[in-house]
Amino acid sequence: MADDDIAALVIDNGSGMCKAGFAGDDAPRAVFPSIVGRPRHQGVMVGMGQKDSYVGDEAQSKRGILTLKYPIEHGIVTNWDDMEKIWHHTFYNELRVAPEEHPVLLTEAPLNPKANREKMTQIMFETFNTPAMYVAIQAVLSLYASGRTTGIVMDSGDGVTHTVPIYEGYALPHAILRLDLAGRDLTDYLMKILTERGYSFTTTAEREIVRDIKEKLCYVALDFEQEMATAASSSSLEKSYELPDGQVITIGNERFRCPEALFQPSFLGMESCGIHETTFNSIMKCDVDIRKDLYANTVLSGGTTMYPGIADRMQKEITALAPSTMKIKIIAPPERKYSVWIGGSILALLSTFQQMWISKQEYDESGPSIVHRKCF
């Protein structure tokens, strides 16, 4: 990269939202849902300029007549054609750049299938002709954004939650744990428990309404049992929400029962540990000498950590698991929804990072598998 004036593009492809922008910016320029929508009905009016597919916000706004699909599930791309549409939309409509002129930094969840990043690499070089690219681990970027080099990141997005311990800038791969329970599962769970209240949400469009209810009204209880008792005895916790058609629904204990599944996955019929226990287990897999530093630097990142009360609850739960004298500090930066992207924006600018890019030339020589050699 001899030219200094060509900014790298940073794209954080989340399962729920795609965050994209230019390296060096302090926030992503474009944030839109990772959705591709296709019409459910036949177009009858000629000249309307109907398209056979819509991406992002446009799909969201026309959701009443579309079937919405998320091409990324649990952090893994399941539909590459749709994924290509999302990238195309990112480059040409959102950022308005020519991808063949900019290096591109992409992000990925740890412990993803190897084929996933190979295919990402292949599409970037062969379809979009990028001059260089790199795939970074999401949680590592979040730690960069928080200004630390040591800590454990609990990153929970829409599709996947993972805990990554990092010491002096090195991720410790043997201690990384991944939990396929995140925002989308909570949305589905909220759909289910609202049905018990007599509100029916079934279509892909209605799921988006429930996601909005979740984001606006849910919170994490410090003491779940006590909160349930409060909700049963008074209506102080009830909130109302107006649906797009003007109907008003009331939601009570669902407000904290929904995110409680993060701490008790058995609510979803899952046999895994909650996020607090996963974080603790991840720390316990690390060398005994560095645990103290990890407990004192537990960083939350991702949209599913945005619930009010989640940091206090994590503090309480981890304190209960850890040795009694241990100092535990949960760091929840206000911009943590975008901290992966912000970390990518920082990384792509570092002078020491410039030799890490995979160039088009290296790709042509080695093929997609080069990504495993050059990207951690």
UniProtKB/Swiss-Prot annotation:
Residue numbers bearing the Methionine (R)-sulfoxide modification: M45, M48
InterPro entries, sorted: Actin (IPR004000), Actin/actin-like_CS (IPR020902), Actin_CS (IPR004001), ATPase_NBD (IPR043129)
EC number from the UniProt entry: 3.6.4.-
Tree of life domain: Eukaryota
Subcellular localization(s) per the UniProt record: Cytoplasm, Cytoskeleton; Nucleus
Catalysis: reaction(s): ATP + H2O = ADP + phosphate + H(+)
Pfam family, one: Actin
Residues modified as Tele-methylhistidine: H74
Listed CDD domains: ASKHA_NBD_actin
Location, primary (coarse class): cytoplasm
Post-translation changes: Oxidation of Met-45 and Met-48 by MICALs (mical1, mical2 or mical3) to form methionine sulfoxide promotes actin filament depolymerization. Mical1 and mical2 produce the (R)-S-oxide form. The (R)-S-oxide form is reverted by msrb1 and msrb2, which promote actin repolymerization.
Sorted UniProt keywords: ATP-binding, Cytoplasm, Cytoskeleton, Hydrolase, Methylation, Nucleotide-binding, Nucleus, Oxidation
GO molecular function: ATP binding; hydrolase activity
GO cellular component: actin cytoskeleton; cytoskeleton; dense body; focal adhesion; nucleus; plasma membrane
Annotated family: Belongs to the actin family.
Miscellaneous comment text of the record: In vertebrates 3 main groups of actin isoforms, alpha, beta and gamma have been identified. The alpha actins are found in muscle tissues and are a major constituent of the contractile apparatus. The beta and gamma actins coexist in most cell types as components of the cytoskeleton and as mediators of internal cell motility.
Its biological purpose: Actin is a highly conserved protein that polymerizes to produce filaments that form cross-linked networks in the cytoplasm of cells. Actin exists in both monomeric (G-actin) and polymeric (F-actin) forms, both forms playing key functions, such as cell motility and contraction. In addition to their role in the cytoplasmic cytoskeleton, G- and F-actin also localize in the nucleus, and regulate gene transcription and motility and repair of damaged DNA.
Assembly description: Polymerization of globular actin (G-actin) leads to a structural filament (F-actin) in the form of a two-stranded helix. Each actin can bind to 4 others.
UniProt name for this protein: Actin, cytoplasmic 1
Organism (species): Xenopus borealis (Kenyan clawed frog)
